[in-house]
Amino acid sequence: TAPKPIDTEANLGVMNAENVNIVVHGHDPSLSEMICEYADSKEMIDYAKSMGAKGITVSGVCCTSNEVAMRRGIPMAGNFLQQENVVLTGACEAIVVDVQCIFPALGPLSKCFHTKFITTSPICQMPDSDFIEFDAGTAGEKAKQIVKLACENFKNRKPELVHIPDLKHKATVGYSVEAIVKTLDGVTNSQVDETGTTKPLLECITSGVI
């Protein structure tokens, strides 16, 4: 689906101490979309509850975070520089990565906690990770496997190591070209102009109104 204006939250405080926390990180939106799809399914939520959690929280890091935020309102745990911090909360059951922007330290760092560091691309396998290859043909099957693995890892969490900062901020995201053009259609005179263009905005700029 195309991005649209939607409310979300950002910073490490979006992680939930009572839920299974899955963090998606990287640049492949097809992976993060499928993770979100299955994490939101009744089957997986019930499975998480059977493991002792109250539900499942998916949050994002880096560019993947922006993709799922502006399409689904998925909260943003942090930017590129905060990827290690989500593990340091002690509440991350799985951090799922794809092709780039991945700190090599995530592997050994995750071993200091209970976090599953899951790599999914053959070109980006890393030490101290669980490799689950993701491709379009088996996307649903592999996403479900990853979500299930995260749920099963909830029982391995060490409560004494959990520290989620009480810090998060509200945000409205999703101002894509499509969303902006749709808004501009509302001020377009369809009797004399075509809809679906940025002409109203351009006219405001060229006339000096903006």
Language model feature labels by segment:
Residues 1-210:
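Metallocofactor- and cofactor-centric catalytic cores in central/energy metabolism, strongly enriched
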